[in-house]
Amino acid sequence: MINLRKTHPLMKIINNSFIDLPAPSNITSWWNFGSLLGICLIIQILTGLFLAMHYTSDTMTAFSSVTHICRDVNYGWLIRYLHANGASMFFICLFLHVGRGLYYGSYMFLETWNIGVLLLFAVMATAFMGYVLPWGQMSFWGATVITNLLSAIPYIGSDLVQWIWGGFSVDKATLTRFFAFHFILPFIIAALAGVHLLFLHETGSNNPIGISSDADKIPFHPYYTIKDILGMLLLILILMTLVLFSPDLLGDPDNYTPANPLNTPPHIKPEWYFLFAYAILRSIPNKLGGVLALIMSILILAIIPLLHTSKQRSLTFRPISQCLFWILVADLVTLTWIGGQPVEHPFIIIGQLASILYFFLILILMPITSLLENNLLKW
């Protein structure tokens, strides 16, 4: 009998991607986050679709429509908080996925890595626009502050800002277009994720020791399907705990106040997952310089393959580089904390030092340390 799974044009693609895919036998739980990101994206698209059925993208009714979803729609509160906290889980998985890539040298798969960086930008853009939709105080002022950063671009800056706003301030036109973009982007992300996977399967997965695993492969199913299901259950457990016990833990209380252009909140800050980049932006006194540093803080990921000077791919057997990697992680946690603090002493200087350390570690210290470790191999 012909095995339909291996011959049917559609099922063949699924089979070669998720069933008969040869996978390294030693990949750890750090390799689970790709599938978890897929689950997060599905959760976000489904909950977002149901929210869009009841949401109105008009400045007069947006805030009320979100309240209506929470109070009057069947399980509307659940859908809304799953969507809001699902975004946080998405970013936790994203940061861990990128961190895994940095630690184990997965960035040496250039196409996969660069599409991943593109995906990160797309997810960040989607999350930013989604935060504007409830039309609370932080939505309005966050949109105003972040879009205003484009005015730092010489010559065309102010025209560009007004073009994005669709007027002379963040208003009805801005909200409507942000809703449209927020709706379409997840589908673009899904398509990009497919391309990301396509390029990954051209080379096969990396593994913790960073050497070729061609000599020792196992089928993806059942070994890694079971492993991914375990990760998925843990993800859903954490997400549901967050949603059912403290749904507003990661949100901002200011967003429960309807948007008011005449009243500025005491501290304008984005969602927690943008705070590290926001801290880098704020630590530079010059507007254009701050914007460039903000963009570079993420775009620096694209040049990491060029900074790889080590003879070994992963950090598994490089203790000095491991120390620097964990210092970088601690630095990012510090930046996240600083981003949520008011602009006053001592937070300003801590933010500036943490920002300098961030770029210094990635651009100078880590490549030099890799060269040092190459020499240590000769001893």
Swiss-Prot record:
One of its GO terms (biological process) is mitochondrial electron transport, ubiquinol to cytochrome c. Keywords: Electron transport, Heme, Iron, Membrane, Metal-binding, Mitochondrion, Mitochondrion inner membrane, Respiratory chain, Transmembrane, Transmembrane helix, Transport, Ubiquinone. Its main location: mitochondrion. Its cofactor is heme b. GO terms for cellular component: mitochondrial inner membrane; respiratory chain complex III. One of its GO terms (molecular function) is ubiquinol-cytochrome-c reductase activity. The keyword Protease does not apply. Belongs to the cytochrome b family. Heme 1 (or BL or b562) is low-potential and absorbs at about 562 nm, and heme 2 (or BH or b566) is high-potential and absorbs at about 566 nm. PANTHER family: CYTOCHROME B. This is Cytochrome b. It comes from Chimarrogale himalayica. The gene is MT-CYB.
